[in-house]
Amino acid sequence: MQRIRCLLALFALEATGFAGPASAVAQNPADDWRPRTLPLYGVSYSPEVGLLLGAGLVHTRYAFRALPPSTRLTAAAAYATGARTYRITLAGEFRRPLAPATVAVDLYASGLEIVRYYGLGNATVASGPDSVYQVRQTQFAIAPTLSVPLAARLRLAAGVMVKHARTHADSGTLLFAAGPAYGSGFGAAGVRTLLELDTRDHPTAATSGLHLVIAAQWYPALWDAVRPFGSLSAEAATYASTGDPPRATLALRAGLAGVSGTVPFHELVYIGGGTTVRGYPEQRFAGRSGAYANAELRLRVGWLSVGDVGVLGLADAGRVWGEDDASRRWHAAGGGGLWFALRHRRASTVSVTWARGTEHPALYVRVGFMF
């Protein structure tokens, strides 16, 4: 669950997403349909990752006076000062005029997917120094996908995933002592599918709507996978607000996931950190299945000339299940924070949150909200 999301979000200067030309057609109708290239930039912070700085470019091209765009190309790179590693992503989306399907190709090289390993189970301890639990792993992946709309705001996507992970054998770490059966490198190729319903009014700072994602992956016994393995996950988030523009927003989210087969350690279900249960280290708990829930109450308390100012309260909980795991404990955390929307634009929202679990408090800074 944690691996499919990144704390770093990227802004496009003067535009976010597929920038449509409708607002300026009357002034410059010819210019609005020309190809455009915009810079991207982003920043976030979490304890184990550190300061994550990112930049990139997004190029958008339209067919003859047709929306949505026919081509969108994105290139981005980020570096984490705490984890001392990087993530590079290349993505392309391609559409033919009047055709409903979208072809996407995603490539990435990343050392940020897995940064900690505390062992398998819901009751693992973290009494040693932090260096014992650190993981240095670089993942390389390519994933072509075909996406088809089933209804308004509902899409089905399917494709293949080719992935290789290289793990450094750092002596003195818990992972080195456990000794992954496959050694330092693991390659696999499989298929994946995703069903997504998205009625949110904004992707990173929603105030209304529903977001539901159900995803599955399966890898046959090919390459370094001696036996088949797979995963299934589901996540749902909903939002309710009062006022126009919204003065208060209640955001709720729940998710669960499970794996089967002979799974490499980096494909386990992980709970903890800035994308699942805040107030715990990244990948604090690992298991063959897991669940989490989050709640945030976001209040707008100030309307300044430069933007909106707000506060929020949060509560998170989650757990994993391992083999013969007798623990019944749910790991919970609570906290709060501030948020600011520059120029009253939700696309320019930055949030700063503080959360405390049972081990130590943690500070998070990100573009938008966690969900």
Predicted regions, residues:
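Extracytoplasmic gating/loop element in the C-terminal half of outer-membrane beta-barrel translocons
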Residues: 241-322
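Extracellular loop and loop/strand-boundary signature of outer-membrane beta-barrel proteins
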Residues: 76-78, 127-132, 176-182, 218-224, ...
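Outer-membrane beta-barrel translocator domains and adjoining extracellular loop/strand segments
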Residues: 68-70, 87-90, 115-123, 168-175, ...
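Outer-membrane beta-barrel initiation region
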Residues: 24-115, 155-157, 167, 180-207, ...
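Membrane-embedded beta-strand positions of outer-membrane beta-barrel proteins
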Residues: 39-41, 73-77, 103-107, 156-160, ...
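Outer-membrane beta-barrel transmembrane strands
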Residues: 45, 129-163, 184, 197, ...
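Outer-membrane beta-barrel translocator/channel fold
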Residues: 78-90, 96-142, 255-274, 348-354, ...
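Outer-membrane beta-barrel "beta-signal"
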Residues: 192-195, 336-340, 345, 360-371
